[in-house]
């Protein structure tokens, strides 16, 4: 099995470069990518740099804000040590297989290793055409760019595994979508951009040699502990199943709807990736769909765990030639691994839901207690985020009931549930102060409300960016009360409600 370190092309001189690139994926066979330079833009202007993330990656934020840094972030200049490529992958899109997708408007500049020794990709999104662009122009409008910046950084602040956003650049050019819009480029950071669809790309071609090379690379980079397993490829699959089950549970605990859970948007590192038509639930409805292209609700909120499990089954199909005998035994092993998804998901979900309800001890009936609350919320139009936040003040003080009751169309529905909840809380050994502190740490006050994101996008399209910057700052502290910004916690008024979201590609 190949080792990641053997593929590194870093030299001592690279360490002093403004961006300390240490590239490995670009040393894989050329079937994995196309070498391509970003397309230059007319008048790049820096909109935002994520200073904290830059420092984590051992990049001086001052460089990124300099003329040379802006030139690199806009694709107008190639930084020393960068080896730009567009990655190849395939994917199932809404259940239909497409044998070649790939980075049609994104270019991987290279990789860096952070201060803790963890490797990250640095990628430009909206940086021009590649051979995978099909009929696209390779560009991005400012709306999808700032949407991904807002939501990915909010997810990180919520503690949910996610790709990150390092910078946003305005291109000074216009892009044509349903109307003419200002262009932008996002600098995305990810543990990697290896997707289920990356494995499907080689499996669909019967290219077992490169499939094995890809699996070896992924194991060395993300799951090195499985190298010593009797069947490392099966152990690799088991690890990805567990990781993605836990990730999907985290989504369900904050009311996040990805919107386009295709296999090419499923990262094997277990990070949330590709935020196109994503949204957060306001009033709780388990069947909620926002994405304009999800006409049949395939990726509705309640369907997300099943969608991820389906994607993992496709991942298993791609890996079959590497597992066991590659035949009947491999299928048997893969099926057993997929069957474990529900156990991983249920354990993570119930553990998270217990904390949201102030429960520490594991007791029978806890899942039913949580499910009953969600049913009552759905029937009474209760806001998902605000209900759980308000419970923090009601767990040990009935004076807090009024705030929760006010979120229910029929307050008696909450009254009936809260009797059971308080009875269950009485079996805990925590002090009220400890319980409240713990609940406040997992039940956010602030999420990226859809109407707030849309307001930031509208302002940005008009050349006003204050809303974007303020929203990013508020969402960086989602568990703090922030009285000055209390309005950001409120659900939309009827005229503000966002009913559909769009990819914007």
Curated annotation (Swiss-Prot):
Binding site for Mg(2+): 265, 274
Positions that bind ATP: 102, 104-105, 125, 137-138, 188, 195, 274
Catalysed reactions, as listed in the record: L-seryl-[protein] + ATP = 3-O-(5'-adenylyl)-L-seryl-[protein] + diphosphate; L-threonyl-[protein] + ATP = 3-O-(5'-adenylyl)-L-threonyl-[protein] + diphosphate; L-tyrosyl-[protein] + ATP = O-(5'-adenylyl)-L-tyrosyl-[protein] + diphosphate; L-histidyl-[protein] + UTP = N(tele)-(5'-uridylyl)-L-histidyl-[protein] + diphosphate
Enzyme category, top tier: transferase
Catalytic activity, EC: 2.7.7.-, 2.7.7.108
Pfam families: SelO
GO terms, molecular function: AMPylase activity; ATP binding; magnesium ion binding
InterPro entries linked to this entry: SelO (IPR003846)
Domain of life: Bacteria
Record's keyword terms, sorted: ATP-binding, Magnesium, Manganese, Metal-binding, Nucleotide-binding, Nucleotidyltransferase, Transferase
Active-site residue list: 264
Entry cofactors: Mg(2+); Mn(2+)
PANTHER family cross-referenced by the UniProt entry: PROTEIN ADENYLYLTRANSFERASE SELO, MITOCHONDRIAL
Function according to Swiss-Prot or TrEMBL: Nucleotidyltransferase involved in the post-translational modification of proteins. It can catalyze the addition of adenosine monophosphate (AMP) or uridine monophosphate (UMP) to a protein, resulting in modifications known as AMPylation and UMPylation.
Family: Belongs to the SELO family.
Designated name of the protein: Protein nucleotidyltransferase YdiU
Organism expressing this protein natively: Nitrobacter winogradskyi (strain ATCC 25391 / DSM 10237 / CIP 104748 / NCIMB 11846 / Nb-255)
Gene coding for it: ydiU
